[in-house]
């Protein structure tokens, strides 16, 4: 289980975002979490969770329906939200270290409906001028697609159930929880089909 050969030198890292809408250019990024999937005894395993609550950027759109869906109140001071640039540093710097620690050249984003998470991450990186983004700019692994193939279901909660993994609906729609659970799903799929 060598990430330099198993994934062509890319460290798989699950990213999950919670947002205030579907438009990565105009809607606020509210939470960001990343979980490297690392080799260990018996296969691949979720690593440490790196997370940050994010302050909406100036002029960001906040769709009421999205806020209701996630249950996030962007104005809640108890969230401990950071400006986007600081949140990116908080989450992505440990990922850069993990990439180096595993002798990889970059991270490859893993996500459930990965294009959504990738688009919001890239928009925040571009908006803030964040330097040294550890992720490949466009390649990713999508666990919705992988779970559809492996377990016959693309909905995260149902895929987790079919994979025999724990899922708590009460904790869902938290970037940290969803990222950690998606990392467990990805690791299970990789361990099942690791060659």
Feature names for model-found ranges:
Residues 105-108, 135-139:
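Residue-level recognition of the N-termini of beta-strands and the immediately preceding loop/turn
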Residues 108-115, 119-120, 124-125, 157-195:
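Acidic, Mg2+-coordinating catalytic module of metal-dependent nucleases/exonucleases
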Residues 118-138:
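Substrate-recognition/cap helix-loop segment adjacent to the acidic, metal-dependent catalytic center
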Residues 17-19, 32, 118, 143, ...:
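Generic detector of well-ordered alpha-helical packing
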Residues 1-112, 163:
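Conserved non-catalytic scaffold segment of RNase H-like nuclease domains
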Residues 54-70, 74-77, 143-180:
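Active-site-proximal helix-loop-helix substrate-binding element of RNase H-like nuclease domains
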Residues 29-33, 126-129, 179:
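Glycine-rich, phosphate-binding/catalytic loops in enzymes
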Residues 22-24, 148, 184:
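Conserved protein kinase catalytic core
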């Amino acid at each position: 289980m060598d990430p330099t050969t198993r994934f062509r030198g890319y460290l798989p890292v699950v990213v999950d975002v919670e947002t205030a809408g579907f438009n990565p250019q105009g809607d606020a990024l509210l939470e960001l979490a990343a979980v490297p999937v690392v080799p260990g005894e018996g296969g691949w395993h979720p690593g440490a969770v790196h997370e940050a609550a994010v302050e909406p950027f100036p002029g960001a759109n906040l769709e009421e329906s999205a806020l209701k869906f996630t249950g996030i109140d962007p104005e809640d001071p108890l969230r401990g939200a950071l400006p986007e640039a600081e949140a990116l540093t908080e989450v992505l710097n440990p990922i850069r270290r993990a990439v180096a620690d595993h002798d990889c050249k970059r991270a490859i984003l893993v996500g459930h409906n990965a294009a959504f998470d990738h688009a919001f991450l890239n928009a925040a990186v571009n908006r803030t001028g964040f330097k040294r983004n550890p992720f490949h700019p466009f390649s990713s692994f999508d666990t919705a697609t992988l779970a559809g193939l492996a377990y016959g279901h693309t909905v995260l909660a149902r895929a987790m159930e079919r994979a025999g993994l724990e899922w708590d609906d009460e904790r869902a729609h938290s970037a940290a929880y969803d990222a950690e659970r998606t990392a467990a799903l990805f690791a299970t799929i990789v361990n099942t089909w690791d060659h």
